Amino acid sequence: MAYTLTSIVLGVVVFGLTRIIWGSISWNLRYRRFHSSDGCQQLRSAPSKDPILGLDHFFRLGKAAHNSRYLEAFQEWFQAVGSTFGVNLMGDYVIFTNEPKNVQAVLVTKFKDFEIGQRRRDNSAELLGIGVFNADGQTWEHGRALVRPNFTRKQVADLGLFEKHVQRLFEALPKDGTAVDIQEWTLDTGTDVLFSESSDVLLPSATEVARKFAWAFNRGIDGIAQRIRLGRFARFYYDPQYTAACKFVHDYVDEIVAKAVYRAKEWHAEKKDKPVPPDDAEEERYTFLNALAREGVEPKQIRDQILNILVAARDTSACLMSAAVFELARRPEYQVQLRREIAEKLSGRQPTFEDLKDLTFLNHFVKETLRMYPPVPLNARVAKNDTVLPRGGGSDGMAPIFVPRGQLVVYQVYSMHRREDLWGSDAHIFRPQRWETTRPTFEYLPFNAGPRICPGQQFALVETSYVLVRLLQEYSNIEARGNSAPWREHLTLTCSVGQGVWVS
């Protein structure tokens, strides 16, 4: 028996060593092939006190995240090491980059060499299931095709939807100057666009269920972000509050999906009886939820896709809106300039879609908000194949680097947007006037790029611009209340204002 056990242990050891040796040989052969054909050079690595597990880096980033300094810590890292480098994080070797040419390669020119990857699906599936946010291949393509009509120019140009929610915001803002956190309001428009019904979290009549949905959804997103930061140790993450939040979100959305499925059956029956609508019939607004239900998609899959898009569309809009109001409330000089432009162009009337495009300084203000506070400040892809990135190798970081299949590449938009060599010595300062002459390319990516560019970017831009105009028309002064400290990150899958956006 002892002999057999010894043989088994020895066999396991030999097998493990063989895999390690073969993996090393295989990697070196692949590296040499790319080195000879593409001129790849060694990627720089961040210096570490623990070259085996990189515990010093792992705990450093954990502390930074706890102190709401995660993005700032990476910015310091890039300044110290370079625009592209490798880091060992608890046994995971990760490539970090804020180099525009590398980001362009990952998202556009070498798009087919990269994917979202299984780890993101594993980390987010408990809340989101599988959908356009975390899927690859045909699942992603199909979901993307269905959601695209939700954000066409015709849909986005329907400003009546935004005005409805602006009026609800005006109702919610106390007349006596009491402060309110405007970040909560942005959930309403997101659910209205996707569900055809609002969560109404800001209305005085809002139900406890609606408010709990807003809380549970945010709590679920926090849990996903925590899992992602834990890397390969995410499988050991357990938080009963996160699990409860996921269940509540599912129950809430399942009720909405059930209503949509019922409406879809009625729609098909009516279409069968009246295949040609009358000439004077009012055209129905397209919603992603109704489209999925009418296509006959299973309710569970509808829920998954809806939650995936809610993350992408709602959170993008929410982060942009909250950051814009955060800056506006703290900069009375820009309020004066914006009011002057709005008064000259609109003469007191509500803006049209075309008006919003003609408000030059407003557009500069929104662009600068996106530069300073990109809604998705960092993102990641996994290499599907052995490939090459154009920068990061050699002593100066200008040579190509080999990226093996399965390699995680994290690209940092936040720090790229604040690089002084790309944006000037005032890159860290909020200055909308820079957009009078600035014409950036891949150094400015607030909504991603390539085939996976954010489908809701026009929705976010139009909503933010419209709401800013209406706030400035309605109120003679917008003041920041509560915490007057500088902007602090609240980083999950997106990045919002950590201290909230308390205004009156």
Curated annotation (Swiss-Prot):
Its cofactor is heme. GO terms for cellular component: membrane. SUPFAM superfamilies: Cytochrome P450 (SSF48264). Its EC number is 1.-.-.-. Heme binds at residue 454. One of its GO terms (biological process) is mycotoxin biosynthetic process. The chain crosses the membrane at residues 5-25. It is an enzyme of class 1 (oxidoreductase). Cytochrome P450 monooxygenase; part of the gene cluster that mediates the biosynthesis of the alkylresorcinols called soppilines. The biosynthesis starts with the HR-PKS pspA-catalyzed carbon chain assembly through nine chain elongation cycles, using acetyl CoA and malonyl CoA as a starter and extender units, respectively, to produce the polyketide soppiline A. In the first round, the KR, DH, and CMeT domains work to produce 2-methyl-2-butenyl thioester. PANTHER family: P450, PUTATIVE (EUROFUNG)-RELATED. Belongs to the cytochrome P450 family. This is Cytochrome P450 monooxygenase pspC. It comes from Penicillium soppii. The lineage of its organism: Eukaryota, Fungi, Dikarya, Ascomycota, Pezizomycotina.
